[in-house]
Amino acid sequence: MRRREFISLIGGAAAAWPRAVRAQQNPALIVGYVGAQSRSFYADRLRAFHEGLAETGFREGREVLFEYRWAEGHVDRLPTLLSDLVASRVDLIVLPDSTAGSIAAKRMIPTIPIVFGTSADPVQSGLVDSWNRPGGNLTGMVLSNTELVPKRMELLHQLVPAAKTVGLLVNPDNSGAADIKVGQKAARDLGLELRILNVTSDNDIPKAIAKLAEEDVRPLLVGSDILFYVHRERIAKLAAQQKLVAVYDRREYVQVGGLISYGASLLGFHRQIGVYAGRILKDEKPADLPVMMPMKFEMAINLKTAKALGVTIPQSVLATADEVIE
């Protein structure tokens, strides 16, 4: 029977066998992977994660085994799923895209190493002590697209130069406040007014987009939020129906009919989470691994959508695109 580090959910101590020592006796370490959505939602992300993990010498079914847990969109299930992984005595927990899950893990699990992916400021949310020296047992990646709002606003201004008002779709329950603050400044700098559209559920999406069309506001900036990403095809379709010129934060919107996107590479983000997981399995300490942000940004353009909207994409914009859908 494999000897493992026993870890109590209520803050108990670990029988501190280094993972490298245990790996010599039985090479199959166990990683718990907790997704906030369904497994199918993570297909491409998981591939990228495993590519990053393999870079460090760990392959599923060989050097490492996996315990997968899926919340199926029910964030309130995350604490239960985390408890289950602790009972399974995993060596590492990966929370690739849930701020709520990461905060719960921080509170519940004081010793098992945790790699997170979040859109929140990790210091302000209490996940780590600092970006460079996280302290504790958590580290990971931050996918914050708020800093790119001015660039997206500028893109909208280039596409609809005569517009005086820009719509901003945000979820006030998540990262909406940050998007609004940055968006207001970006709009002012371009001499534009900002029309804020608050959306907290999928039922609000068609109402918000219809409201913008009723007010004859054509440019739309879709904020960074998991709710919008899950319903990206619906949002892209509604925007097209209302003849809105919309800019998004991820290329996946463009691949399902959205006009244009600019943001961090999502697959690169998950690949780096895999690299960090591997480094920790090699006994590096989360406390010493700086919280990272993506370094690669990409633009995607759907020319078919542009034609349907009657929008001309400037050559200067086309020249910088990483993906162009004809």
Predicted regions and their residues:
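Short hydrophobic alpha-helices and adjacent helix-cap/hinge residues
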Residues: M1-E326
